[in-house]
Design a protein with these regions (language model features):
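Detector for outer-membrane/organellar transmembrane beta-barrel domains
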Residues: 187-301
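Hydrophobic, lipid-facing positions within transmembrane beta-strands of outer-membrane proteins
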Residues: 57-61, 101-105, 158-162, 190-192, ...
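Outer-membrane beta-barrel "beta-signal"
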Residues: 305-307, 336-352
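Transmembrane beta-strands of outer-membrane beta-barrel pores
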Residues: 41-45, 81-85, 121-123, 170, ...
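Cleavable N-terminal export/targeting peptides
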Residues: 1-28
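Outer membrane beta-barrel
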Residues: 23-45, 49-182, 186-188, 196-198
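Repeated loop/turn-to-beta-strand initiation elements of outer-membrane beta-barrel proteins
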Residues: 69-75, 111-115, 170-173, 201-208, ...
Length: 352
């Protein structure tokens, strides 16, 4: 079998889960290996007691691949790592560590769907992406998921997940069973998401999404927690404008003395001003009751300038008017900043 390998392999950079990739291997039967990478440097005064700016580095690196079985199916897989990722391994390591964001293998059966297992890219990202448009701030929904599953990064990714995804016309579907692992202390979990894209011709496109997840802790490991998440939202596309709106709730039982409930609303707007410039704005509200009592009320304004098709400069300001949360006398935070302290962000992002 004739094979082609790029003569110069790209040096180690750090990976993104975007569709951007460099193909470094291709076989005659269609099998491929792709390199993903991202490097970034950010200046921000987020969570700085003196209000001074500080520099932060982030980077990702990884490989994804596909091996052709026949014309109907392929073996697929991905391993993606990040410096300073929001993973459990970094919560127990004081130093920035290279930790796994995604590590999975599966079968792509074309029109019959795709099955993946491991630390997968959750189908619930169809929902969370509605609010996840900024380089400088994170979505806040499902923030309590890691109280029942230590490996969970909200509902984006969790160890030991077996997932099925497919597309039927304009309908995208995803369903998963979460087995967990020895670190998870999880009895079971499952989730599902549906997205339907409505083409309205000259009036644009509407893409409503519904999502849910359920997790149960393993009482044999002393984890007597129960977690439920659901959300509804939509994106609307018209020319160079994209608008998004979502609402979600999650309930955590067995961690606090009462049932802890987060209610989250997020609104986003993106305008591609030109091939080089993009403008973004958004509002985020989170209200917790029965738990840490955290409240978020964030307004974000962001400007992106595209240096190349894949690399950009971002600058933003996040106005925060929430209230800090507390658990056992210790402040809880989300997004790396106090809920009542605004901050700026300036960053350069290189992507391959």
């Amino acid at each position: 079998m004739k094979k082609t390998l790029l003569s110069v392999l790209l040096p180690a950079a750090f990976i993104s889960n975007t569709v951007l990739a460099a193909e470094i291997y291709q076989a005659e039967d269609g099998s491929t290996v792709d390199l993903y990478s991202r490097l970034g440097f950010n200046i921000t005064n987020k969570n700085n007691a003196h209000g001074d700016g500080k520099g932060e580095f982030d980077g990702r690196i990884g490989l994804s691949g596909s091996q052709t079985i026949n014309e109907h199916a392929s073996v697929i897989g991905m391993a993606q790592y990040q410096v300073g990722a929001a993973e459990y391994a970094n919560q127990v390591n004081d130093k920035p560590a290279l930790t796994a964001r995604y590590v999975w293998a599966g079968i792509d059966a074309k029109e019959y769907g795709r099955i993946t297992g491991g630390r997968v890219s959750s189908g619930l990202i169809m929902f969370t992406d509605i609010g996840d448009v900024f380089a400088s701030s994170d979505v806040s929904m499902a923030r309590q998921a890691n109280k029942v599953d230590k490996t969970a990064t909200q509902v984006f990714r969790q160890d030991g997940t077996l997932q099925y995804q497919n597309q039927f016309g304009n309908l995208d579907v995803s369903a998963a069973y979460i087995l967990g692992n020895n670190t998870s202390e999880l009895d079971y979990g499952y989730n599902a998401a549906l997205r339907y894209t409505i083409d309205m011709g000259d009036f644009g496109r509407l893409a409503p999404v519904v999502a849910m997840q359920k997790n149960k802790g393993d009482t044999r490991e002393g984890n007597d927690t129960d977690y439920t998440f659901w959300g509804v939202g939509t994106r609307y596309y018209l020319g160079d404008v994209m608008l998004g709106a979502l609402y979600s709730e999650d309930e955590l039982q067995g961690f606090y003395t009462q049932t802890s409930t987060d209610k989250v609303t997020e609104l986003t707007a993106v305008y591609n001003l030109s091939d080089k410039w993009a403008l973004r704005a958004g509002y985020r509200s989170l209200q917790n009751s029965g738990g840490d009592e955290l409240e978020l009320s964030d307004t974000t304004l962001e400007v992106q300038y595209k240096l190349t098709a894949r690399s950009s400069i971002y600058t933003s300001y996040v106005d925060r008017n929430g209230e800090r949360g507390y658990n056992s006398g210790q402040e809880t935070s989300f997004g790396g900043a106090h809920a009542d302290e605004s901050y700026y962000h300036f960053g350069l992002r290189y992507e391959l």
